[in-house]
């Protein structure tokens, strides 16, 4: 009987398990959360989430919801918390996926979401203020393109534990409201454009364990209230903009294990009191103006792994207690005023110690040695007993006198243009002797280094090179030497005279594609002969792109045989893109050439036989005859005939596009057959052509009478060749032969937006509302790229409907960069030559030549209103009645009837909310005061519905802003005194790449001071 009971019990137990299993497996994700995930996917442009399966089913290995076998750094996971009947999404982690959307605005549909990690993607836009109403515990947006300010609403996230916003494009001040986060532990804000002082409310952040604010533009001093952060474990303040001294209150933070403060300006100060920091592992106080002796107590810290006190003014001997640091991984005392003997324990330590540029007495090392303590330039000149200030080189013997220096940094020996470049392949920091009259010293180790390939102090990568100039030897740029702190090359045996130092650079660690790996920013300083020649040098900016070569030249005089070149990292730039450990100086090659004719080396004279005079005379005569003969032949063939200035200018430029011959273009266009003419642009005629491979092209030809000249032509080539974006017209190449100046573009089937909207009836394209919305957003995205996202900061200057082209899918592409203006160094410019199209130009630009990207924003606003209305900003109903769209829109707003602007051809088939938003955005963009106009990234966010900015409120403020009224009146007087021919006006045609908007309008019409009913009623 007992056996039967036991069997019965077992049976019920198994059945219960089965029923329970079925019960648990029936747990589902609420529809509201599924819908919210779909919204998140749409915003992020996350396309591989499979909504046909359960996102919370952890047994699924496919479907895009999780990828347990992903490579290091890549994460793709949605995590749920499931009870017996229901599941809730708690974590969304999407790392290193190059997502190219924007941040999801509304997270209210995911009420249980605790973590949102979008590290290392290509997301743009701003941080939605709506996130402040969520229950998030951790937010990470590290390594994206997020711009705008940090919303104060995040201060409402009382549950927030981690906020990681490093390596973005955030600007403005830190909102004081963040000081109200009672549970905040990690706050990472490094490598943005944040400004202002650290908010005093941060004194309340007593739960902080990790704070990083490096590479920003903060002002003020490091606050004393840091003593309140009693649980702080990591503090990183490198090149933050804050000034010293380091407050003594920092000594109260006994839990610190990682302290990195570098590049502080301000007065000299003594070493901060750190005696109580017995748990310290990483102590970096570089370039902080510290004075006095090294504190002896540091030698008693047995947990220390990295000690960097470089570039200060510390003096005195190295304390005897520092012998206890023999197990420390790295010690850097570079560039101080330390003196006395170099301790024997340091000599025996090897290349993990760097004491270069100090005042030590001569040490036990008679000669410099690789893989030994780096004593390069570590002895006072008074002790070295020679003219050198390099102690371990005091016995260096020059093999001969050199009249040049050529180094293939990080690479093998090569011969380029008959010049031998020495190898530079050593892979460990420290000292290196080439045995060819030059040495080098590399200081620093890359902290938090995640690199897994190549060497730690050199890099090889030819896949990213974009060198098309045949005069540049690409082999010099396929590798590079790296340094974490400071890299020095020193020639020791140069002959006396004047030289030109050529430093060769190419950024080969970033990626040019629209991926997070191209978001890195590298900055370092360049010193020649001890003088800082360049501060905050950025290879990508100088070379106009990734993988492109640039050479910096510096004249020097050598008097004692020695030439020193030093590259130094000053704490700026990103440190974790594409991975952690990518920062600091990078150089491809060094070439130093004499500005004089060097003397011949011994043994190069003549031997017996003919006299020197006879030999020289024969050689000269033969050479002259040969030159004349060859020259005559080449002249007869036309090879030596003078080239046009344009050809000469073009030959000296390195554009990343193809070069077409005039013969190819003539074949493609049937010798510019008038039947193939499709328009008349600002440059001249535009012809359709078909290449031999079947590619359809549009050829823009610069006409002799064009108002746009050589400068604009070369400018357009330079701009477009460096830019790639879905909403910019693609430039295939160009042709420069004699006076023939041609641009070869992709052919866009649907011509211009102006032709589609308000061209001749037979050319118009019926554009429904979704098409118009798509076109408007596309234009905004293209401009946002030009202004904020491209390596170059570009102001187009001539945005209008005829400069927006439409492909076969009606995707908009911005064209005609002939008027584009680089904006590299300053945020504003006073243009000496106003160029644009009347009716689209912003008032401040039309009147004063005051050019910023806000001029493009104004022009975009006009185009946006034209898209809604379907008519040009200025069009005539009759000879006596000229219609001005901007005037009418403002009057309709005053009458609260803005939707009357909508194109009657749409009828009622349009989204009223979207239309109203587009009209308001257009009005906001055309605000008279530039400061009232939004950035284009903000415009994109508003158009896509990702921003909660109250457009109506902003518009109200801008309309009531009278600060620019006098300037507008002045502008009207200005236009009253000049002829209409002085404004850039060209006729409208039906071809692409055209300019338009010829108008008889005057300044009073286009830029009225008060846009209200009274003005409208008094117009004539």
Curated annotation (Swiss-Prot):
Membrane association type: Single-pass type I membrane protein
Swiss-Prot/TrEMBL LRR repeat ranges: 86-110, 111-134, 136-157, 158-181, 182-204, 206-231, 253-276, 277-301, 302-324, 326-349, 479-501
A UniProt-annotated Pfam family: Malectin
MF term (GO), any: protein serine kinase activity
Enzyme active site: 798
Domain (Protein kinase): residue spans on this chain: 672-949
Known EC number: 2.7.11.1
Similarity comment text for this entry: Belongs to the protein kinase superfamily. Ser/Thr protein kinase family.
Protein name: Probable leucine-rich repeat receptor-like serine/threonine-protein kinase At3g14840
């Amino acid at each position: 009987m007992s056996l039967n009971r036991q069997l019965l019990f077992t049976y019920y137990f198994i059945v219960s398990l089965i029923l329970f299993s079925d019960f648990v497996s029936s747990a589902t994700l609420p529809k509201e959360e599924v819908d919210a995930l779909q919204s998140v996917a749409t915003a992020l442009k996350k396309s591989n989430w499979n909504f046909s399966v359960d996102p919370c089913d952890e047994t699924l290995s496919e479907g895009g919801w999780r990828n347990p076998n992903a490579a290091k750094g890549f994460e793709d996971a949605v995590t749920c918390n499931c009870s017996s009947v229901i599941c809730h999404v708690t974590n969304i982690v999407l790392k290193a996926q190059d997502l190219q959307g924007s941040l999801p605005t509304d997270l209210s549909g995911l009420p249980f979401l605790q973590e949102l990690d979008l590290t290392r993607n290509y997301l743009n836009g701003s941080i939605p203020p709506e996130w402040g109403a969520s229950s998030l515990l951790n937010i990470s947006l590290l390594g994206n393109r997020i711009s705008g300010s940090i919303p104060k609403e995040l201060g409402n996230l009382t549950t927030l534990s981690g906020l990681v916003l490093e390596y973005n494009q955030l600007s403005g001040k830190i909102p004081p409201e963040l000081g109200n986060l009672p549970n905040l532990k990690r706050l990472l804000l490094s490598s943005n454009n944040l400004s202002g002082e650290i908010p005093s409310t941060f004194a309340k952040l007593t739960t902080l364990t990790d704070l990083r604010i490096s590479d920003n533009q903060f002002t003020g001093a490091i606050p004393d209230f840091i003593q309140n952060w009693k649980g702080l474990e990591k503090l990183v303040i490198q090149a933050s903009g804050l000034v010293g001294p380091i407050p003594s209150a920092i000594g109260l933070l006994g839990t610190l294990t990682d302290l990195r403060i570098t590049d502080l300006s301000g007065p000299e100060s003594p070493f901060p009191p750190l005696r109580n920091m017995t748990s310290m592992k990483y102590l970096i106080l570089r370039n902080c103006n510290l004075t006095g002796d090294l504190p002896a107590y540091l030698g008693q810290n047995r947990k220390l792994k990295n000690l960097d006190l470089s570039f200060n003014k510390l003096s005195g001997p190295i304390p005897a207690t520092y012998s206890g640091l023999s197990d420390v991984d790295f010690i850097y005392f570079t560039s101080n005023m330390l003196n006395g003997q170099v301790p024997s324990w340091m000599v025996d330590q090897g290349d993990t110690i760097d004491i270069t540029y100090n005042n030590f007495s001569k040490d036990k090392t008679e000669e410099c040695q690789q893989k030994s303590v780096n004593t390069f330039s570590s002895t006072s000149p008074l002790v070295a007993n020679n003219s050198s200030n390099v102690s371990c080189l005091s016995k260096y013997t020059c093999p001969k006198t050199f009249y040049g220096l050529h180094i293939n940094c990080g690479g093998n020996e090569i011969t380029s243009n008959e010049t031998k470049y020495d190898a530079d392949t050593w892979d460990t920091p420290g000292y290196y002797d080439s045995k060819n009259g030059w040495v080098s010293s590399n200081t620093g180790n890359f902290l938090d280094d995640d690199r897994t390939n190549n060497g730690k102090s050199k890099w090889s990568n030819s896949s990213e090179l974009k060198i098309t100039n045949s005069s540049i030897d690409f082999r010099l740029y396929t590798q590079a030497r790296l340094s974490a702190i400071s890299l020095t090359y020193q020639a020791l045996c140069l002959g006396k005279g004047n030289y030109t130092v050529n430093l060769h650079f190419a950024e080969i660690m970033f990626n040019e594609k629209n991926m997070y790996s191209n978001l890195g920013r590298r900055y370092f300083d360049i010193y020649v002969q001890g003088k800082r020649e360049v501060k905050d040098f950025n290879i990508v900016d100088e070379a106009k792109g990734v993988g492109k070569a640039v050479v910096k030249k510096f004249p020097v005089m050598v008097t004692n045989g020695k030439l020193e070149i030093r590259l130094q990292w000053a704490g700026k730039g990103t440190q974790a893109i594409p991975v952690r450990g990518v920062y600091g100086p990078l150089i491809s090659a060094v070439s130093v050439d004499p500005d004089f004719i060097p003397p011949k080396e011994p043994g190069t004279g003549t031997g017996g036989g003919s006299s020197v005079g006879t030999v020289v005379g024969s050689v000269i005569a033969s050479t002259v005859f040969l030159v004349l003969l060859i020259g005559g032949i080449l002249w007869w063939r036309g090879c030596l005939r003078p080239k046009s200035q344009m050809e000469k200018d073009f030959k000296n430029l390195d554009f990343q596009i193809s070069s077409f011959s005039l013969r190819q273009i003539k074949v493609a266009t049937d010798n510019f057959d008038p039947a193939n003419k499709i328009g008349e642009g600002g440059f001249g005629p535009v012809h359709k052509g078909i290449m031999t491979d079947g590619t359809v092209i549009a050829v823009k030809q610069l006409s002799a009478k064009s108002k746009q000249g050589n400068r604009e032509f070369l400018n357009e080539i330079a701009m477009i060749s460096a830019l790639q974006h879905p909403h910019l017209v693609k430039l295939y190449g160009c042709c420069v032969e004699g006076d023939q100046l041609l641009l070869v573009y992709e052919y866009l089937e649907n011509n211009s937006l102006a032709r589609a909207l308000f061209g001749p009836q037979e050319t118009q394209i019926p554009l429904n509302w979704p098409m118009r919305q798509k076109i408007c957003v596309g234009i905004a995205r293209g401009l946002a790229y030009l202004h904020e996202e491209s390596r170059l900061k570009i102001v187009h200057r001539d945005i209008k409907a005829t400069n927006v082209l439409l492909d076969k899918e009606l995707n908009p592409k911005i064209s005609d960069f002939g008027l584009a203006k680089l904006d590299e160094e300053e945020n504003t410019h006073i243009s000496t030559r106003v160029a644009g199209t009347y009716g689209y130009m912003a008032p401040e630009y039309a009147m004063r030549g005051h050019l910023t990207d806000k001029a493009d924003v104004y022009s975009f606003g006009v185009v946006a209103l034209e898209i809604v209305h379907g008519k040009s900003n200025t069009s005539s109903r009759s000879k006596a009645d000229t219609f001005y769209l901007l005037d009418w829109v403002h009057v309709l707003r005053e009458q609260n009837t803005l939707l009357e602007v909508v194109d009657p051809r749409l009828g009622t088939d349009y989204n009223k909310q979207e239309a109203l938003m587009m009209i308001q955005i257009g009005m906001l963009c055309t605000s008279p005061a530039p400061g009232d106009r939004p950035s284009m990234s903000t415009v994109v966010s508003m158009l896509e519905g990702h921003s909660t900015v109250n457009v109506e409120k902003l518009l109200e403020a801008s309309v009531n802003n009278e600060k620019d009224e006098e300037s507008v009146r002045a502008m009207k007087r200005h236009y009253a005194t000049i002829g209409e021919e002085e404004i850039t006006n060209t006729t409208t045609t039906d071809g692409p790449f055209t300019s338009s908007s010829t108008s008889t309008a005057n300044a009073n019409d286009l830029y009225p001071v008060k846009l209200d009913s009274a003005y409208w009623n008094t117009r004539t």
